[in-house]
Every structure is written in structure tokens, then in C-alpha cells.
């Protein structure tokens, strides 16, 4: 389970969650994308659905769906190997329900332990850009790592450190119950070549290297991903066309990486054990 988290909205979590899921699916992995942004569902609306299940995140968390039949909960996207669980809480009832439930913060973690979800190679969980019980239960559902997303703007990074890291600090007591706080892989999204972005990136690296992000840095691990996602129109085009961005741009004459290269490098950093599959997909791209 790989949550994609930032307590600040507008950082690009949903877009990159969907793009990563699409790349992994095209590489032959069986992927489930869960739209955990109950207020503004975006991740699972990027790709068209071939089948929309009658239930979604709401019923999964409220424990009112029979998981023995996958079609009750699992929707199928137009992308082969990519299934989704839709966000379906338009009245915003889940936060209050999970806040008041004794097991609210670990309910998603427990739900995803069902045999139904063991059939997937990767489960990516998008989240809302806010500090809430919903973000907490998504973080606690992780099986080891999560992706943090921030733009190369110091105020945005400070908000990530102030909001997301503080949220993780508040979850540290769960370690007493055997629930480990996930290591955070910070992804810089919407990178640019201007001097301000470059300076901001250098400052971000320094903060992380010096472990100045938390007084509990010995218990909360953050590292900066080498892959940078540049601020390119092709990512908007992918959203509009409803296809994974790596399909739209395999090669480029720009200085920055192509969309395919960016997704390839990101996937290799996060899932080195499947690099052969990613290499095979890259070879297919070269022959296209």
C-alpha cells in the first residue's frame, strides 16, 4: 500500500497518483488506485471507467459492503491491469464517522488486509490536501513507504513540513501497537528551470539532509526522490485526454526528461524490484 500525501492542496497528488498507477499497469503489474480524496475526487476520474462498482470508499470504510464479490467495490478503468475504488462521499460524512469510530484511524488498514486486495501487486492511495482523520487513516494504511508531494516553492515545502510531518508526529503513538509510521519519499512536482526553483530545491535538500524537518527525525524518515516532475503541458493533456501521461510523450528534444522518462525513473526509484518490467515497457516505447 503506497499512500500519496500532502496536507496542502493543489500540489499534484491526484495527477501523479494516476500517472504512476497507469505506468505500473502498462508495465504489466496489477494495480489498484484508491481515491481517498473524499471531498474532491480526482484520481479515479482521470481515466474513463469501463465498469463502475455500486460501492466505493464510503461503503468500504463504513463496513457495509460484501468484499467476497469484487464487483461490489472494485471498478475497472479503461487501462488494462488498473482497477479503482471510487470516492463516493458527496455529503462529507466519512470524516465524522471515522473520527467517532473507535477503530476509525486503522479501519482502512484493516479493510485492505482482506484477501481481495492481496491479488494486487501495488495499491496506490490518493488523499485529500488537508490535515484530517482521513489523511491519518490513509497514512496508517501504508505497508512501509508513502509519497509526499510538494512544489519547489519554499512556502509550499514549509507547509508540507508543518502540516504533513506534524500529522505523522501525532501518529507516532501507534507504533506501540505495532503500526510503523511509513518512510516518506518526497516528490518534487511542477519543477522549473528558473533560479527560484533551483534555489528552493537546494534548500529542500539541505533541510532533509540536516534532518531539520522534525524533532522526531530519528523516528520519522524523509528522503528526497531524485526524480523531478517538471511543470509541463503534457501533464494537463493527459488529464484532459484521460490517458497515462507516459503514453503521450515517449521522447523529447527538451532539456527536461520526457513524460515517459519521468514516470520510468519514478517507478524505478519506488519499485526497483520490478525494473525489468519497466525496462521492457521502455523498449516497447522505443519501438513505437
Question: What role is predicted for each listed range?
Answer:
Residues 1-288:
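P-loop NTP-binding core
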Amino acid at each position: 500500500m503506497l499512500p500519496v500525501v500532502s496536507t496542502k492542496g493543489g500540489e499534484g497528488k491526484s495527477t501523479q497518483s494516476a500517472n504512476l498507477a497507469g505506468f505500473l499497469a502498462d508495465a504489466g503489474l496489477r494495480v489498484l488506485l484508491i481515491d481517498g480524496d473524499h471531498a474532491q475526487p480526482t484520481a479515479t476520474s482521470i481515466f474513463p471507467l469501463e465498469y463502475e462498482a455500486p460501492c466505493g470508499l464510503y461503503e468500504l470504510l463504513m463496513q457495509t459492503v460484501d468484499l467476497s464479490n469484487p464487483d461490489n467495490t472494485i471498478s475497472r478503468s479503461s487501462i488494462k491491469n488498473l482497477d479503482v475504488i471510487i470516492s463516493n462521499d458527496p455529503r462529507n460524512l466519512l470524516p465524522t464517522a471515522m473520527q467517532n469510530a473507535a477503530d476509525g484511524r486503522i479501519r482502512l488498514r484493516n479493510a485492505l488486509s482482506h484477501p481481495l486486495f492481496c491479488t494486487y501487486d501495488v495499491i496506490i492511495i490518493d488523499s485529500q490536501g488537508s490535515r484530517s482523520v482521513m489523511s491519518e487513516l490513509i497514512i496508517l494504511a501504508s505497508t512501509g513507504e508513502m509519497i509526499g508531494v510538494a512544489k519547489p516553492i519554499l512556502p509550499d515545502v514549509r507547509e508540507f513540513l508543518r502540516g504533513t510531518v506534524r500529522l505523522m508526529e501525532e501518529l507516532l503513538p501507534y507504533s506501540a501497537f505495532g503500526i510503523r509510521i511509513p518512510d516518506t519519499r518526497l516528490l518534487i512536482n511542477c519543477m522549473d528551470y528558473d533560479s527560484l526553483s533551483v534555489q528552493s530545491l537546494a534548500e529542500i535538500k539541505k533541510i532533509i539532509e540536516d534532518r531539520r524537518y522534525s524533532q522526531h527525525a530519528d523516528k520519522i524518515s524523509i528522503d528526497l526522490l531524485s526524480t523531478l516532475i517538471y511543470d509541463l503541458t503534457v501533464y494537463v493533456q493527459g488529464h484532459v485526454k484521460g490517458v497515462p501521461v507516459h503514453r503521450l510523450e515517449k521522447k523529447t528534444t527538451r532539456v527536461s526528461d520526457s513524460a515517459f522518462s519521468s514516470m520510468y525513473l519514478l517507478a524505478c526509484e519506488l519499485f526497483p524490484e520490478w525494473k525489468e518490467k519497466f525496462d521492457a515497457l521502455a523498449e516497447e516505447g522505443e519501438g513505437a
